[in-house]
Design a protein with these regions (language model features):
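Metal-dependent DNA phosphodiester-chemistry modules and their immediately adjacent helices/loops
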Residues: 23-29, 75-150
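Residue-level marker for well-ordered alpha-helical positions
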Residues: 47-48, 70, 98
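Nucleic-acid-processing active sites and adjacent nucleic-acid-binding tracks
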Residues: 2-61
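Acidic, metal-ligating active-site segments
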Residues: 1-3, 149-150
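Short, glycine-/Ser/Thr-/acidic-enriched flexible segments
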Residues: 8-12, 67-69, 144-145
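Short glycine-rich phosphate-binding loop at a beta-alpha junction
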Residues: 56-73
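Short, glycine/acidic-rich beta->alpha junctions
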Residues: 45, 64-68, 92
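Switch/connector loops and helix/strand junctions flanking conserved nucleotide-binding motifs
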Residues: 13-14, 71-73, 95
Length: 150
């Protein structure tokens, strides 16, 4: 069972809807996206949210992308959470990507019909490096290599 949470800055919600052609505002009204005050993500809001989740759920560890996460990692560690760095390359992404694919194929992923998660999943493609490691990334049109050389 997946219990996802998503945040966007309140002041940029309308702009993002028009720019991305995505129903963020509808999802926010339906409770699938939470907004934070201002025009950038308010990390303090998210940290407090995670702290409250920790009162309800037994959160064993939180995986995070190392890029630009130092302050949030320190704050969550101060709250007692175990923080685990998690890279975004094939080395770290391969084992969980394979497991996710397996669970999806077996029909063992339940997300309660969350439209945000469904939209995000529809914009991800599984990739494989020359060593056979799998990873995920955003869905982009695949360019023809011969065309790039012209």
């Amino acid at each position: 069972i997946l219990l996802p949470f998503f945040w966007l800055p309140e002041d940029t919600l309308e702009l993002r809807c028009h720019r991305d052609h995505v129903l963020y505002d509808v999802w926010q009204k339906q409770g699938f996206i939470q907004t934070t005050e201002g025009n950038v993500i308010h990390y303090g809001f998210i940290e407090k949210f995670i702290e409250r989740l920790g009162e309800t759920y037994n959160i064993r560890e939180i995986a995070y992308d190392r890029w630009n996460a130092t302050q949030m990692v320190q704050n969550l560690e101060d709250m007692g959470f175990t923080m685990v760095p998690f890279g975004q390359g094939f080395k770290d992404m391969s084992p969980p990507s394979k497991e996710l694919f397996k669970l999806l194929m077996e029909g063992n992923i339940l997300h309660g019909g969350n439209p945000v998660l469904k939209w995000m999943a529809g914009n991800v493609v599984m990739r494989q490096d020359p060593a056979g490691n799998h990873g995920t990334g955003p869905l982009h049109p695949q360019r023809n290599r011969q065309r790039q050389c012209l």
